[in-house]
């Protein structure tokens, strides 16, 4: 019996020192885009149920965007990367399957 417990990794990305990062399943990413945009690449071969959470740590997605690179997997069946422009946004993507790809599990702004 699986209890569904995930080993979460908390990652703080500061755009003054890093502008690109590749996420792993379970990451909770606090993105500080004060200085520059940040691109986060989703896992290339995710398992069904894989999750990645994104949080606008400084409320600056409008001035310096967070770009989510889909890494060849669809996002809500789409073939475009996500560009986040809403200050204070926080959301979780969960991997569904090869057709739907990554889907929003939660999305707040």
Region roles according to the model:
Residues 1-70, 98-109:
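Exposed extracellular interaction/assembly regions and N-terminal maturation sites
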Residues 86-101:
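Extracellular disulfide-bonded cysteine-rich modules/repeats
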Residues 26, 71, 86-90:
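Tight coil/turn sites that cap or link beta-strands
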